[in-house]
């Protein structure tokens, strides 16, 4: 999986996604503009690239669901919900943990189970 995720990461960087996603923060996966998953990462670009790889491989139930949705013509997308404000590693983890919970409660995404 590592090579596929690395390839997706470098493709995303080459195509101009780094300024938006290469940060610590809270991101979401959308199907037809509906938030279906909320996650946190110290580097959202790397995490989103890993999600792309997993969707291609269908390695877990949530990724098989997303792959099937795409196969049926639904649009899949990613977006940033929140950028971390803290700079220290421990503070970022605490901040993102709290914010992730807030966004999960706010959106009740079906794939956060």
Q: Whereabouts are the PLM-identified features?
A:
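Short secondary-structure capping/junction motifs at helix and strand boundaries
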Residues: 108-113
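GIY-YIG nuclease catalytic motif and its immediate N-terminal context
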Residues: 1-46, 90-91
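Serine endopeptidase catalytic core focused on the charge-relay Asp
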Residues: 99, 103-104
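Conserved short loop/helix modules at catalytic or binding sites
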Residues: 19, 42-90
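Compositionally biased, intrinsically disordered low-complexity segments
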Residues: 29-32, 68, 107
């Amino acid at each position: 999986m590592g090579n596929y995720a690395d390839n997706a990461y470098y493709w995303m960087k080459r195509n101009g996604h780094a300024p938006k996603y290469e940060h610590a923060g809270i991101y979401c996966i959308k199907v037809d503009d509906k938030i279906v998953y909320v996650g946190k990462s110290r580097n959202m670009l790397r995490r989103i690239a890993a999600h792309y790889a997993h969707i291609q491989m269908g390695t877990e139930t949530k990724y098989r669901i997303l792959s099937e949705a795409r196969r049926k013509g639904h649009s899949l997308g990613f977006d940033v919900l929140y950028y971390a404000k803290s700079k220290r590693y421990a503070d970022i983890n605490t901040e993102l943990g709290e914010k992730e919970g807030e966004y999960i409660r706010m959106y009740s995404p079906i794939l956060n189970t």
